Amino acid sequence: MLMSKLADVFKNHKVFIPFIVADDPDFETTVKNVVALAKGGADIVELGIPFSDPVADGPVIQAADLRAFAANVRTKTVFDIVEAARKETAVPIVFLTYLNIVFKYGYDAFLKRCADLNVAGLVIPDLPYESRDEIVPIAEKYGIDIIPLITPTSGHRIEKIAKSASGFIYVVSSMGITGERDEFFAGLKALVAEIKQYTNVPTAIGFGIHTPEQAQTMAGIADGVIIGSAIVDLVAKEKQQAPAAIEKFTKQIRVAVDAKKQISVK
């Protein structure tokens, strides 16, 4: 397998990964939002491909998907957004997508297009571990990481998921769907410690984080922090003025995350 571009991002510092939905509220604003996140200090940008049945997502992200559908989003639109953003930023990008989107486009064609645009990885919430072999070999051919999710209920599956991981591991902070919350799984630190027994692949915690204080706490537990709903909510409120607002928010999170001791991922 090719060396992971994403794992390299985690070397020597804590990583911040903001999430936005592609084509929300429109094409041009999404391109500007990606650039704004990079300017604000994002290490990796997670770009959601809208889907009609997003089982992992809460109401904020579901509403963003609906706004994107109203803007007539297609999978090609998402690739075109990345192509336009690439004229202004080289920030690593990962897609959050559901398996049917990739399947309908064609695994090889989808992953080749990702490689052409320097999309470094895919997060696929509805990809069962047992089915990963239908896509991972093709992803490896193009040097793209299929980023696994580990949840508080992964249990005995943690070892095999961790040992087969590449890029980074998306650690789900609590059960349920995405969305802002004030309480997280009490065993999160122990969960990350267990993952670390099996792999040197970095971990990033997501689901529910929405304040600099929470981000700082999570950066003390894992190698990176993922924030989605709080940023998507800003996009909903600010619409075409969102780039300035999310750049400001990203800078605040960057400061909070950087306050944690720098680490070196082996």
UniProtKB/Swiss-Prot annotation:
The active site is at residues 46, 57. It comes from Lacticaseibacillus casei (Lactobacillus casei). Its EC number is 4.2.1.20. It is an enzyme of class 4 (lyase). One of its GO terms (cellular component) is cytosol. Keywords: Amino-acid biosynthesis, Aromatic amino acid biosynthesis, Lyase, Tryptophan biosynthesis. This is Tryptophan synthase alpha chain. CDD domains: Tryptophan_synthase_alpha (cd04724).
